[in-house]
Amino acid sequence: MDKNLVIIPTYNEKENIEAIIRKVFSLEGCFHILVIDDGSPDGTAGIVKSLMAEFPERLDIIERKGKLGLGTAYLTGFKWALERGYDYVCEMDADFSHNPDDLPAMFAACAECGGVSVGSRYCDGISVVNWPVGRILMSYYASKYVRGVLRMKVHDCTAGFVCYSRAALEAIDLDDVRMKGYGFQIEMKYTAFKLGFRIVEVPIIFVNRKMGTSKMSSGIFGEAFWGVIKLRFRKFHKKGE
């Protein structure tokens, strides 16, 4: 049986974390969860640790000091997963923006293609709920911009609901991933694409968080915008080559 891991980065997610963990563990299939908490002052980590006795060997946490960024959280999780023999690793938000019910389809698609599966908001029109029109348009056209510059055949290039195969993660030099905010999502997909891995999109409905606070900022957006141009002219090699 494949070993499937869900990585959930957190910062001040006490309103959501227990519910999202219980929802994932209620699904058919054996999913494990790794929470990576960046020193949440609201007690998020304590909630996770209180649940670990209830879900032994399925729930783990890495606690970091301070807000170190989304990208570094996932990179830490990827390395942790590879060391422990996981076959497929899926990124997921803690706030239910990504529906846990889509996890089986995400893992199945990744296993079938052997590369990367993307929970896509834009492969079947625009499937976003509770976002202001301005943010929807910014996100949609940002993905079109990335797709045009990088010539990558992915409709939702900035998606954060992404599943990677072990083969893809082992081929990517994780120590050479340079973008740390949401640009990290673009860089990881593009690196896998340039290394020859298939990327498939799974249609999802993205629902804006109902509880907690968004972590998006203009600085994060700017890093992604300019980082795409730099990516276009980088050369990529499989790790060790």
State the predicted function of each range:
Residues 64-83, 88, 100-182, 209-226:
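Acceptor/aglycone-binding surface of glycosyltransferases and processive sugar-polymer synthases
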Residues 15-19, 42-51:
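Acidic helix N-cap motif at the loop->helix transition within catalytic regions
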Residues 37-46, 96:
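A conserved acidic beta->alpha catalytic loop
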Residues 1-23:
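N-proximal low-complexity "stem/linker" segments adjacent to membrane-targeting elements
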Residues 8, 30-40, 62-63, 92:
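Short beta-strand/loop segment that forms part of the nucleotide-sugar
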Residues 22-31:
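Short, acidic, metal-binding catalytic loop of nucleotide-sugar glycosyltransferases
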Residues 3-5, 32, 187:
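Cell-envelope/extracellular polymer assembly enzymes that use nucleotide-activated donors
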Residues 152-153, 176-180, 189-206:
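Catalytic donor-sugar/metal-binding loop of nucleotide-sugar-dependent glycosyltransferases
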